[in-house]
Design a protein with these regions (language model features):
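Folded extracytoplasmic luminal domains of secretory or organellar precursors
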Residues: 2-262
Length: 262
């Protein structure tokens, strides 16, 4: 089949639109509202619904947030990063604040309940007290790639997870997924069972915490089901993701082939 000149031009325009459309959608801000919760030092809370503990209080320098059910996603949204900016130009900066999701919370038609540090970061210099006096503000937000983790680099493609202190070698294994590169949510975790030659699903306990009783002996191979912010779901694999003699409290990093969208 051959195209004439006008058909070729139209074809090029349509293909270009199909390529660029997901990028344009991904960079669009969504209107919402934000408020903040109180803490003694302005940082986050160690008791957040994601199960991060003390890590969830200080990660990203305390610029953290509880989010609505729609963004929490039954725990799959834990660790996601968003740019949030206030829509009052007289009180707020243009860039706003980049936050990490560490908790679940519903406010007055809000999608974000920010830590005090994060809410103050929305404000222009010397306008933070005025902004906080409002209590709730109109904002807009968009999903962004996470770049807060100490070992993160723009070209890295990693999943960072910690063996929960509640784990009991070798009878009970619980993992907390701390960081995922790009704009990916982890929606399933499975372990390879060498004895039965099949994958066995871990259970999402709550938030970012996954567990399994009687895990496989020896080095453990994991696979993670990731879902991008545009809804594409795929699996990534990590051989020997957890060593044979694993210990509670240890953290590991799986170098995997995640889709890293800008």
């Amino acid at each position: 089949m051959e195209f004439n000149k006008h058909e070729k031009q139209l074809y090029t325009v349509v293909i270009g639109f199909l390529v660029l459309f997901p990028v344009l959608c991904a960079s669009t801000f969504t209107a919402s509202r934000a408020t903040y919760y109180g803490t003694p030092d302005g940082y986050g809370t160690p008791s957040g619904a994601c199960g991060f503990g003390e890590y969830g209080r200080t990660v990203n320098n305390g610029y953290v947030s509880a989010v609505s059910r729609a963004l929490y996603k039954d725990g799959a949204g834990c660790g996601a990063c968003y740019q949030v900016r206030c829509k009052n130009p007289h009180l707020c900066t243009y860039d706003g604040v980049n936050i990490v999701v560490t908790d679940y919370g519903e406010g007055d038609r809000t999608d974000f309940i920010l830590s005090p540090r994060a809410f103050s970061k929305l404000a222009l210099p010397k306008a933070d007290k005025k902004l906080m006096s409002y209590g709730v503000v109109e904002v807009e937000y968009k999903r962004i790639s996470c770049n807060y983790y100490p070992t993160h680099h723009i070209n890295n493609s990693v999943i960072t997870y910690k063996i929960s202190e509640h784990s009991n070698y070798p009878y009970y294994l619980a993992l907390t997924i701390l960081h995922v590169s790009g704009k990916n949510d982890i929606t399933a975790v499975e372990l390879w069972q060498k004895e039965t030659n099949q994958w066995k699903a871990m259970r999402r306990v709550y938030g970012a915490v996954w567990d399994m009783a009687n895990p496989p002996r020896g080095p453990i191979t994991l696979r993670f089901q990731a879902t991008t912010n545009l809804g594409y779901t795929y699996w990534v694999y990590s051989t020997n993701a957890i060593p044979k003699l694993w210990k509670a409290g240890a953290a590991y990093q799986a170098k995997v082939k995640l889709i890293i969208a800008k």
